[in-house]
A protein has these predicted regions:
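Gly/Trp-centered helix-boundary motif
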Residues: 1-153, 157, 161-162, 301-313, ...
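Alpha-helical transmembrane segments of integral membrane proteins
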Residues: 123-339
Length: 339
């Protein structure tokens, strides 16, 4: 199905080689499914119904915030849909899990509480549903990892490509800039920034991207150095092509192989990196759902709450394992020895 949209013969060969790696294909499918599930989390786990018909009117609480007065409730500032008195002809459609990632289960005796039919993966030390926080937390992990990868790749390819194409003084000064950035203690800088500014996903992405492009620049520089004097580039120069056209039209598409190869591994490193920061308390602001924060709770409650270690660890291992399988498939597909 996809093959009919691929016009480039080399790209088609690479795609067919990737398809031969069944483990990589299955891992890709599972990752796509996991992306859909986490970004559709409000439809799967929510303390508000997806649809409600009440007193002859239709409501969509999961998508629209309603005032208690809309339901004739005068003695509350919020609507507790679980305890709301409904008419006999009312219809309520709930998500699969009736918890949001921030609310506590007040019906259990103590926190953290073990897995039950109400809380599949148990609750954390504040009574919040672990399954829901894992589902929502994955969205932040993926968003962080992909954003850092995109920004770092763009900056690294741009600067590395310019160093490789022009060489000479541009390459010399560019290399010195890379060396300066490599000497910066990123973790200490991150701690300083968090102590000054309010921790957020944007801040973490910004700092990680500013100091995460150097590795990409090395690969881009090497590829541009190798490709800038090849015959097809010389032919483009002879036909009067501009520098920008030569860089972006001819050299860049033929220099992306190593960069694309490392993309799944880079994203996996981003997921584990954010989990590590959250585990140490330097990541997303509390009470944002986070895998690392759940693992930190597991460390504190290891002897009494095995589920806090088991389920977050399994989620982290599974996601990283799937990205590694995809990365292996991409690496084999783009391997020049397989051309």
């Amino acid at each position: 199905m996809i093959e009919k949209y691929i016009e480039n013969e080399l790209t088609l060969k690479r795609w067919r080689r990737f398809k031969k790696r069944k483990t990589a294909v299955i891992a890709s499918i599972l990752l796509v499914v996991s992306f859909i599930l986490t970004f559709a989390a409000p439809l799967i786990a929510n303390s508000k119904p997806l649809y409600m018909s009440h007193n002859g009117k239709s409501y969509f609480p999961a998508f629209v915030d309603y005032h208690p007065k809309d339901f004739g409730i005068a003695d509350s500032f919020y609507v507790d849909y679980r305890k709301m008195a409904l008419a006999e002809d009312s219809l309520v459609i709930w998500p699969i899990v009736k918890w949001n990632p921030y609310e506590s289960n007040e019906e259990v005796e103590s926190y953290p509480s073990k897995p039950t039919s109400s809380n599949w993966f148990g609750t954390d030390d504040r009574g919040r549903d672990v399954f829901t926080r894992l589902l929502y937390g994955y969205k932040y992990s993926i968003a962080y990892a992909i954003l850092v990868w995109i920004i770092s790749t763009i900056v690294g390819v741009l600067l590395g490509g310019l160093m490789g194409y022009f060489g000479g003084k541009v390459d010399f000064f560019g290399q010195r800039v890379v060396e300066i950035f490599n000497t910066v203690p990123v973790f200490l800088l991150l701690l300083t920034m968090i102590s000054i500014f309010k921790p957020s996903l944007f801040l973490l992405v910004l700092i990680s991207s500013i100091f995460g492009w150097m590795g990409v620049s090395y690969y881009a520089r090497g590829e541009f150095l190798k490709n800038r004097n090849l015959e097809f580039v010389e032919a483009a120069r002879g036909m009067g092509a501009s520098t920008s056209r030569i860089i972006f039209k001819h050299i860049l598409p033929n220099s992306l192989g190593p960069i694309i190869t490392f993309a799944p591994f880079t994203i996996a490193a981003g997921i584990s990196g954010l989990a590590g920061l959250d585990y140490l308390g330097f990541g997303l602001e509390v009470p944002t759902p986070s895998w690392g924060e759940l693992l930190a709770q597991a460390h504190k409650n290891f002897t009494i709450a095995w589920w806090l270690a088991t389920f977050p660890s399994a989620a982290l291992f599974s996601s990283l394992f799937l990205f590694v399988l995809v990365g292996d498939g991409v690496r084999d597909a783009l391997d020049p020895k397989m051309q």
